[in-house]
């Protein structure tokens, strides 16, 4: 059989070996889909990926750039948002808990209603992002 923490240890090791973290996820019922939540639950392990102290959680994963591409059928960020955004604060909080603070979000919004505009906005956001456009990291 597999040791109880073997999968968790493997996933944490993969994260530790990266120069940057790239996640791509849809908004699913206002937050992350179950498969991403499962990965986060395996990686966010007390005593290994973070320590719990009287002053709060202290991440043990070295900070690295994290770029999170988020797609949504509707608008969830900005002044035109018509639904609450629980995804970006949740991912920010859990990555901060691990020790990752250099976080950027790229949103592809309203793909269900205006896909051409959504993809044009996404391309513009990618072109403006220094790490994705070939600019200085």
Please place each PLM-identified region on the residue numbering.
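Glycine-rich phosphate/pyrophosphate-binding loop and the adjoining helix
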Residues: 78-137
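Helix-loop-strand module that forms the ligand-binding subsite of alpha/beta enzymes
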Residues: 3-89
């Amino acid at each position: 059989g597999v040791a109880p923490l073997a999968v968790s240890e493997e996933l944490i090791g993969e994260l530790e070996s990266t120069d940057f973290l790239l996640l791509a996820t849809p908004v699913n019922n206002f937050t992350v889909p179950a498969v991403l939540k499962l990965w986060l639950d395996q990686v966010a392990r007390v005593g290994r990926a973070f320590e719990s102290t009287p002053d709060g959680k202290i991440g043990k994963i070295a900070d690295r750039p994290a770029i999170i591409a988020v797609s949504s059928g509707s608008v969830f960020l900005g002044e035109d948002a018509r639904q609450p955004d629980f995804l970006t604060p949740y991912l920010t909080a859990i990555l901060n808990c691990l020790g990752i603070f250099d976080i950027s979000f790229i949103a592809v919004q309203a793909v269900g209603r205006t896909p051409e505009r959504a993809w044009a906005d996404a391309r513009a956001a990618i072109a403006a992002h220094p790490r994705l456009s070939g600019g200085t990291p």
